[in-house]
Amino acid sequence: MVLIDATSDYHCTEQMIKMMVRDAYEDGNDRMFLEYYTMDDIDIPTLEGYRVMFKTNNPEHIWNSLDHKEFLMQLGGYVVNRKDGTEGLTIAGLLMFGKGLPVRERFDYLRMDYIDKSNLIGDQRYSDRLTYDGTWENNLFNFIRMVVPRLTRDIPRPFQMDGIIRKDDTPQHKAVREAFTNMIIHADLTLNGLLRVEKYDDR
């Protein structure tokens, strides 16, 4: 079983959303708005997973009472085109929370791939691999949730207490998450859609 650090995954996702929405605004509303992509293209379990994390980190936030579309609008994942009244998902909304098929239709060159080349035995090429195989909706939020624990599971977690709360996070874990987050943020997914993460024993 993979244990998810809700706080860490939430902050990774929050940072990516802010960066993608900011970049879209800088390039203009046309790039931000995806015509014909609606809430039907959102993977609701993915969005609900993020909302659980959001509520955990912001228990009193007013957005917690919004429906899914209104919540996405507040994040910048869904917009209304004021020129003609049309509405739909943004690039950030689809990439972060979309169903796999609409994501692949809109970004047909996008590939998300994780390969673990650590702890190899004999002539093994890899000890673990995550790629799209039809068992998960391949959006960025799911990729984050599945890859971050794999990247950090071999890093020791010393027993530390913050008052009565156990503190498991370390500078090493934070550095790995930050590097992973920056890789995605700085990748131009509208041009070059390859997200490839490789893990080694000695790198």
Kindly give the residue locations of the regions a language model identified.
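Active-site helix-to-loop segments that bind/position phosphate- or nucleotide-bearing substrates
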Residues: V2-G193, E198-R203
